[in-house]
Curated annotation (Swiss-Prot):
Keyword Nucleus set for record: no
NCBIfam families: PRK11783.1
Protein name (record): Ribosomal RNA large subunit methyltransferase K/L
An annotated GO cellular component: cytoplasm
Protein localization: Cytoplasm
Keyword flag rRNA processing: yes
Functional description taken from the UniProt entry: Specifically methylates the guanine in position 2445 (m2G2445) and the guanine in position 2069 (m7G2069) of 23S rRNA.
Reactions the enzyme catalyzes: guanosine(2445) in 23S rRNA + S-adenosyl-L-methionine = N(2)-methylguanosine(2445) in 23S rRNA + S-adenosyl-L-homocysteine + H(+); guanosine(2069) in 23S rRNA + S-adenosyl-L-methionine = N(2)-methylguanosine(2069) in 23S rRNA + S-adenosyl-L-homocysteine + H(+)
Originating organism: Shewanella sp. (strain W3-18-1)
MF-aspect GO terms: 23S rRNA (guanine(2445)-N(2))-methyltransferase activity; RNA binding; rRNA (guanine-N7-)-methyltransferase activity
PROSITE patterns, per the entry: THUMP, UPF0020
CDD domains (alphabetical): AdoMet_MTases (cd02440), THUMP_AdoMetMT (cd11715)
Highest rank taxon of the organism: Bacteria
Keyword set, alphabetical order: Cytoplasm, Methyltransferase, RNA-binding, rRNA processing, S-adenosyl-L-methionine, Transferase
Organism placement in taxonomy: Bacteria, Pseudomonadati, Pseudomonadota, Gammaproteobacteria, Alteromonadales
């Protein structure tokens, strides 16, 4: 009897142990990401050819305690390597695990390599050569908890590589994962009609057809690890392969199970057909191009087993939530009598099916932890009478309080926005505490920003509420799900800075009181336009005529544009970011503003103030609540530093000049007493700078008009 270890993804251990038991292996012991077993050589060959779940099978040659580099070397040296492979063969060592005296896997591999080479030399042979890639004989070593296991890679390249896949589609499913889905769903034990409406490159259906047709999954592989092993019995192996080929030929002819696959992507369906043909099961599977929401049950009962798209694969989160919700509705209405098994990495997506799972399991798709849920759809008992809206959501079913509130807000604000001459505005701002999001409308797009929930609320609850928001939105305000953009932010507590999200750009042009501004809805946490400062910008424009205007911490220069359009004599725009200065220039160009009177300065604003000798008639400053940028010499805290900041700015203000000061610190307290002693007059103007769409959140910012006393 020989000792083996069958490696597999985490979560496969139980299924793999059952499979090995059915093969006739003995001394089966589950471990982490694999199963130990013993078997004679003939059975080991059969297992290697027929296993549908294992990723790799290794023949254990040595296993024992190891507490030093010397012990590791001796353990490897004591193995009779010339009895396992010829010095004419190349070899490689795959070492896993660190700890104790092994700081890195390369060190462990090197020690074993030295021992192997020395053993050949000491036995009077020339040393074999090491090949880092495509070696003839592969040594597999594992070090864990002071125990070293040295083995031979018996199976060769990963066993999930069956040999039938031509190329992969987007986010391919590994073959042994598909096989495990079929096993754990119960389908393999009682094969019946099988449907996969998101078939992709056909992996689930092909693996199922291989099972039903009694085709060995390794039959098309052209390489195995034992081929250069000196104890390999070629005749026995060839007999096992010949038997498998005979069974496959007979199995395809006898198979009466029906398989149906569809995908919305015609290229993937074509690929699935090629893969099925390569696997020898194309005649058993009916493929077609179709939207999963339009499929019909091909039989009165059967299994629907699928791996639909999720965040790591495809699509916008709102679109995916809609898709899952509509799928759940379709299953309830049309698939009574069927069983459904679904793999998904996002618990909120799979929860959006609104189906009660019979069983919930975990599986790993590579490193990605996924939920694998099983459902039984009882005929007629779970059908929903209310039709699904075109957007996929019945408002009465999902977050009704949120849906009704935002629907009401949107209706009221749309008329107001048209009258105001704006097309970007806020339609919801955590009006209902349970739905702790802000929803901003930018032309025909919507951005949903999630505020950080209190620590007392479980994460699962906040995720579910956010999913409900994204599900309810399309029907509530009449927007296409693919035009909903999701962002996450905290309520500003002083440390929030502008944050870049990704390289993709979704740029729009918005209009505000006659001014045009460029928006980037996806590149940054903020879009390029602070909507709550809309009236403040207009105020700057109204006060700008004939004046020298300074805009500090200018961001994308929107207040500068209003000043220029308002007839300012000159406009100086200062920001530390090259990106925002370039953006400000773009905004000026959009509005046809050009000339030497418009100056753009990239600089540390605080240092620029200290160095400036000019006078201005109107200054607008909207500093960050807190900043510790690497480009700044010192940190800045608006509460701590506002007196020094304003006193320095007043020195730049002409005798009749005005300073508009705004910030977003929620509990900001203006030190009026100290400023008054400095002959500075301060007046709060929140009442005229808070837009209607922010009336529900009056603490979004605070704004002050400051002059010489």
């Amino acid at each position: 009897m020989l000792n083996f270890f069958a490696a597999a993804p985490k979560g496969f251990e139980y299924s793999l142990a059952q499979e090995l038991t059915e093969f006739g292996a003995t001394e089966i012991k589950e471990s982490v990401a694999g199963v130990y077993f013993t078997a004679p050589l003939t059975l080991a060959y059969r297992i290697t050819l027929w296993t549908r779940l294992a990723s790799r099978i290794v023949l254990v040659i040595y296993k024992g305690s190891c507490e030093s580099a010397e012990q590791l070397y001796n353990a490897a040296y004591c193995i009779d390597w010339p009895a396992h492979f010829s010095n004419r063969n190349t070899f490689s060592i795959d070492f896993h695990g660190t700890g104790g005296f092994i700081n890195n896997t390369q060190f462990g591999a090197l020690k074993i390599k030295d021992a192997i080479v020395d053993r050949f030399r000491d036995d009077g042979d020339e040393r074999p050569n090491v090949s880092r890639t495509d070696a003839d004989f592969k040594v597999d070593a594992h070090f864990r908890n002071g125990v070293i296991t040295i083995a031979m890679n018996f199976s060769g390249p990963s066993l999930h590589q069956r040999g039938y896949r031509s190329t992969t589609g987007e986010a391919p499913l590994k073959e042994n994962l598909a096989a495990n889905m079929l096993v754990r769903s119960g389908w393999q034990a009682a094969p019946t009609t099988l449907l996969d409406p998101f078939c992709g490159s056909g992996t689930v259906l092909i693996e199922a057809a291989l099972m039903a047709a009694d085709i060995a999954p390794g039959l098309q592989r052209n390489r195995f690890g034992f081929e250069h092993w000196r104890r390999h019995d070629k005749a026995v192996w060839q007999d096992i392969v010949a038997e498998a080929k005979a069974r496959a030929s007979l199995g395809v002819k006898r198979c009466e199970i029906k398989f149906y696959g569809s995908d919305i992507d015609s290229r993937l369906v074509a690929l699935a057909k090629r893969n099925a043909e390569n696997a020898g099961v194309l005649e058993l599977i009916e493929f077609k191009v179709a939207n999963a929401l339009n499929i019909e049950p091909p039989a009165a009962e059967g299994y629907l087993i699928t791996n639909p798209p999720y965040g790591e694969r495809l699509g916008n989160v709102s679109e995916l939530l809609q898709l899952y919700y509509q799928l759940g509705d379709k299953f309830k209405k049309e698939f009574g009598g069927w069983k459904v098994a679904m793999l998904c990495s996002d618990i909120e997506l799979i929860s959006s099916l609104k189906l009660k799972a019979d069983k919930q399991m975990k599986m790993f798709n590579g490193a990605l932890e996924c939920a694998f849920n099983l459902y039984t759809l009882h005929a007629n008992s779970t059908r929903r009478d209310t039709p699904v809206l075109p957007e996929g959501v019945d408002i009465a079913d999902i977050a009704p309080a949120f849906a009704n509130r935002i629907k009401k807000n949107a209706k009221q604000l749309e008329k107001w926005a048209q009258k105001e001459g704006i097309d970007s505005y806020r339609i919801y701002d955590a009006d209902i505490p349970e739905y702790n999001v802000a929803v901003d409308k930018y032309l025909d797009y919507v951005i949903v920003q999630e505020y950080m929930a209190p620590a007392t609320i479980p994460e699962a609850v906040t995720k579910r509420r956010l999913s409900d928001v994204l599900l309810a939105l399309p029907a509530a305000i009449g927007i296409n799900p693919n035009k909903i953009i999701m962002k996450t932010r905290e309520r500003q507590k002083g440390t929030s800075q502008y944050q870049k999200l990704d390289e993709r750009k979704l740029e729009l042009i918005t209009t505000e009181y006659g001014a045009k501004f460029k928006l980037n809805l996806t590149g940054y946490l903020d879009t390029g336009l602070f909507l709550d400062h809309r009236l403040t910008r207009r105020l700057v424009g109204q006060k700008a005529k004939g004046r020298r205007v300074l805009n500090l911490f200018s961001y994308t220069g929107s207040a500068s544009v209003h000043a220029a359009l308002g007839g300012a004599k000159s406009v100086t725009t200062v920001d530390m970011s090259n990106t925002y200065i370039a953006w400000a220039k773009d905004n000026f160009a959009l509005n046809g503003l050009q000339g030497k009177q418009y100056e753009f300065v990239q600089a540390d604003c605080l240092q620029w103030i200290r160095d400036c000798n000019e006078q201005f008639d109107l200054i607008f400053i909207d500093p960050p609540t807190f900043s510790n940028s690497k480009r700044m010499e010192d940190s800045f805290d608006v509460q701590r530093d506002h007196v020094n900041l304003l006193s320095a700015l007043v020195k730049l203000l002409s005798p009749t000049g005005e300073l508009v000061f705004s910030n977003n610190k929620r509990k900001f307290k203006m030190d009026i007493e100290t400023l008054t002693k400095m002959n500075i007059t301060v007046k709060n103007i929140d009442d005229i700078t808070l837009p209607m769409d922010y009336k529900r959140n009056p603490h979004i910012h605070n704004t002050w008009l400051i002059t010489h006393a």
